[in-house]
Amino acid sequence: MREGGAGEGQGAAVDEATGFEVGIVVPKLYRGAAAGCGEVENCVARLVRELEDVGLIVERVRGVPAEFIKLSAPMGTLGRVAAEMNMKKLTYIGMELQFEWDQVGAFVRQPDGSLFSWRERFACFRHLIYSIVNKTDSDITLSFDDKEFHWTQNESLLTRLEDEGIVKLVFPLHDEIKRKQLLRSWALKWFDFTWQPIDEIYSYFGTKIAIYFSFLGMYTRWLFFPAVFGLATQLIDFGSLQWLVLPAFFFFVISWAVFFLQFWKRKNSAVLARWGINYSFSEYKTMGNELDPLSFSMADDNVQQRKFGAPKEKSIVQRNEWFGVLLRIRNNAIIVLAIICLQLPFELAYAHLYAITKTEALRYVLTAVYLAAIQYYTRIGGKVSVTLIKYENNQGEQSSADSLVYKVFGLYFMQSYIGLFYHASLHRNIMALRQVLIKRLIVSQVLENLIENSIPYLNYSYKKYRAVHKKKHEKESPAGKSVRLSTRVEKEYLKPSYTASIGEELEDGLFDDFLELTLQFGMIMMFACAFPSIFCFAALNNVTEIRADALKLLVMLKRPAPRDAATIGAWLNIFQFLVVMAICTNCLLLVCLYDEEGKWKIEPGLAAILIMEHALFLIKFGFSHFVPEEPAWVKANRGRYVAQAQNVCSKQLLRSIAKLDAKLE
């Protein structure tokens, strides 16, 4: 991008322009067919002309698989569109106000100096291209190849072309300069371990992806502490104090997890403040959707005379609230029954087969087959979850996405841990449990990384082969001439999208990445006492995961469409739930380790374990209140912004009152 800093003034800002950040894909016509359109105007040529008329910079690229229309926009064009969309942006007094291009200097710039974030720019692009409508008094006849159709009055041109199958795809384009910079400073810097340029990631990919990598980096750094402690418990002989090692490690791990999650909340709020994102306002906008049914019911001539506190409006809101709660209870009950009746027997059968299998090689094969087979079951469960969510009264897309997260995690929770519970509680064989943990962690991580990195590459290679093969057999192609993809945009078009394996209409690819992370966290936390050095495997895997995910996003996939998410959402609640589960399961493991006779009596040792369990629950809920969720400087800035806003509003109100008094006199 070619965006300048905040001090260059509005005149310079008008001349700034983004890079080519959006692409439109249309079928490629033979040159003769494209030239001989007859009297009827070609629809692609009309689309290009309309895009230029609304102020966009257009470049047409004729590639091997299709023709591409690349779009860029001057800052002045984006500014006028943002004002037309009533876009809210943070000002220097801390208030989010409706954007006005004439007052551009009042609005906070992004960390990279640009006026608009990637999410805001992409929203402006989509609004521009989809708001091109037929403003004439009659229908317009357009053609493509031998096909003719009518563009009716007040109809979106791009939507009509999509319905006709002419526009195949509208997708974000990589900025080649920034992409290469991130490759050098982030994806290929393996020796930086957990350090990442989070501000640059935010500027390029948007809030949601940047928050994920910020969380992954902090989680990996904090993993080194239990990894060192866990390794020490395996390598060092503590002599007569050996019996205290595992309880001490258990106490340390739970305290570590509680502090980590609490300090993540602090970092999350600090990062949002640095990016100029008002999270409380985002929550307000999401909660505002809850009043949509009410607003429709009040849409009449006397709406301004109504009061929100009227009994009718209260009853409408309460009815919608409880109806949504009952729908969620019903759908969650369906998922729980499906897990108990269908998945639980399958998981127990696998655990039993694993226990009776004697050969290690066969156990690895059995685990691999099980992990592959369970994918189909979870995909079916995910589709059922998406269908159920459509009938829930969720307040907005984020609420629906959170509901999907909870339901799908329930399926994976049973899948991932029931076999481990089987070995821990029924057989009480800690050595067998350690072997299962190692196999699960190694096999699952190898399979996940193999799928994540190989399938996108194979998908791209297959699409590339098909496009080149098709081009060689076209009439225009000269015989014997080699055909290859020569432009960046056509290579990006053939790459897979960053989508979720389950419920892609609600979530992007971060769903799978967060799911993998939570399952790993649950495994290392709930069975920490059985295998303390498992934290070393997790830390090593996550260091690799940071760079592998970065390469995946920058090299192997299309640029993801930005999503507005200021936190990790429902995943944080799942992490906290897993900490509570870890307290229970590790107490059970300590009972199995110290109750060698299997009498399960409340002797002093077992009583001490129960006391420890209650103490850890107290720590879990107590430490959360001792560590503030926001740093002091964030609270101080908010207070200063509130004071500034009150001062400005009071002065403006006094001026308005003075002008009114002058008119009355």
Swiss-Prot record:
Report if keyword rRNA-binding is assigned.
Answer: no
Return one GO MF term: chloride channel activity
Q: Which InterPro entries match?
A: Anoctamin (IPR007632), Anoctamin_TM (IPR049452)
Q: Cite the entry's keywords alphabetically.
A: Calcium, Chloride, Chloride channel, Ion channel, Ion transport, Membrane, Transmembrane, Transmembrane helix, Transport
Compartment(s) of residence = Membrane
What membrane topology does this protein have?
Answer: Multi-pass membrane protein
Entry's Gene Ontology BP terms: chloride transmembrane transport
Q: What is its main location?
A: membrane
**What is the role of the protein in this entry?**
May act as a calcium-activated chloride channel.
User: Cellular component GO terms, alphabetically?
Assistant: chloride channel complex
User: What's the protein called, per UniProt?
Assistant: Anoctamin-like protein Os01g0706700
Family recorded in the similarity comment? Belongs to the anoctamin (TC 1.A.17) family.
Q: Which residues cross the membrane?
A: 209-229, 243-263, 333-353, 361-383, 404-424, 521-541, 574-594, 607-627
